[in-house]
């Protein structure tokens, strides 16, 4: 069974809403166990437990929040090199469109790569003009149907990769399920 951890910091509740949606998406893949943890209560054992990790943070001046950075700098510092090879992705909520959420996702991915996580983007579209190539993003609370679907899509794709990488379930590979994909054009 694949294990997915959705680790998040939410200053206003918006990123927490995204975390719930990412978790819903991951749970849609059979044989996937999902846990949500707020960064203030998360421990290294939570990170060890998972096969795949979705990390969410509010956008703070274009990058990840200080609480999320502190978790990796302090809580996970002595665990460097011990979580190599787990699959991971990112999501972020900003104060508005153009508020830096994609850059915040990239800053989260940089942290994850430094710890040895295998990060990915999603080529599928969550709607006519909504993607999550760098992670799922929202301007404030995810209200829009396409933004909500992007969060779920990110979670589903994470659980698919966990199924393939950790459980060897090749039938869950995105290319093995063309009917479930939404590509541009």
Segments (PLM) and residue ranges:
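Short helix-capping segments at alpha-helix termini
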Residues: 25-32, 78-82
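A short beta-strand-loop structural module common to alpha/beta enzyme folds
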Residues: 31-42
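Helix-loop-strand module that forms the ligand-binding subsite of alpha/beta enzymes
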Residues: 40-127
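Glycine-rich phosphate/pyrophosphate-binding loop and the adjoining helix
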Residues: 121-185
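N-terminal beta1-alpha1 ligand-phosphate binding loop
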Residues: 2-29
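Residue-level preference for long, well-ordered alpha-helices that form the structural scaffold
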Residues: 11, 64, 101, 140-147
